Amino acid sequence: MKQITKKLSFLLALIMLVSMVFTGCSDSKTGNSTASNTNASSSSSGTADLGPGIALITSAAGPNDKGYNQSAIAGLEKAKSDLGINYKVVETTDIPGSLTQLAGAGYKLIFSLEYNFDALIKGVGGSKPIAEQYPDTTFVIFNDNPNVNDDGSVKHKNVVSVLFDVHEASFMAGALATLVNENASKLFNSADYSFTSGDAGRKVGFLGGSKSNGITVFGYGFAEGINYVAKELGVNYTFYSDYNAGFSDSAAGATKANTYYSDGANIVYAVAGAVGDGVDAKAKEVKKLSIEVDANKDANQPGNILTSVLKNTEVPVYEIAKNFKDNAMDKVNGKVMSYNLASGATGITDLSVIESKITADGKAKWDEIKGQLKTISDKIASGEIKVTNAQAGDKFDKTKLANLKMPND
């Protein structure tokens, strides 16, 4: 009997021990679940189930491009800091495959910065569009709006198209380039630069990474800005362009830019990722000017980068991430989100870096130029100046640019 009692006591103790272990495990799981819910609150609280967080696929230029991609990642980092949302950055050559994998892994918000939309919007190889396969995932694309049917209606309610009014910012850059080119001898110390003067120097170059709406939108706006000022001043310019520069070969960018500089161009604008680094370096070498893009890169080659046309992807990435956190994706789903000069997501830099090179004698003329730029900006905002927007489907008509020759377009 005593042995039976001992056995029963042992069994009761064992049961209590096991019960305590499982209770401890249960508490641990609850704790882990609560911790993850810092980033994935339930919809009953007014915020969305964020799943694993937000995914972002970079463009070919990669995450360390000092511009387009890096700015977008900064938006995600801000969303993580301010809103508690985790994120994943993917660098890939297989955009459709990565979109599918990420959506399949539970990501409900995916940004894709590469100009590659067919598999997402139309479907390829007999497959349904990825957007249709994953209707509960929002896909955000940039620099074009392919998410429309022939009648203008929206194809997929879970696709967001982000457009920057870089055509307007590029117009400003073109106007600035012409004003500076016409007054270079008054603005700068001749010992610091080797500008080509007179008609021989009334030439400008443009390097684009690809012949796509997301790139031509810069070139066309730039050309129109040059023509606008050239017409006002009664002079004629030549616009050299190459839309096959790619995005990674900086040495090739330097070589191509040098052909423009050697032919008399004083300013070359590059919209081509790392190719622009080569253009900037060549501008410094030959003592002329370049124009950069995406982020404020004026200080990369101080005094040789005239300005940068800004495409601040941080602004829309953070805004959309906040809607995601607030369970308010209905505000953006299926829509085209456009960011103009006033939004802070596009424009040109404040010119403070190049301004340090303006001579004392050139200060009055420089202030006059900045005043002219302000007037032009106001006219764009009011609609008095209309700039071709290739991203929105506007057709570019170079025959309307009476003061600009475009031999390559």
Regions found by a protein language model. Give the residues of each.
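Bacterial N-terminal signal peptides that target proteins for export
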Residues: 1-12
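Repetitive helical segments and hydrophobic/amphipathic motifs
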Residues: 15-16
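C-terminal motif of bacterial Sec signal peptides marking the signal peptidase cleavage site
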Residues: 19-24
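Bacterial signal peptide processing site
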Residues: 26-29
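A residue-level marker of the well-folded mature domains of exported/periplasmic proteins
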Residues: 32, 36-409
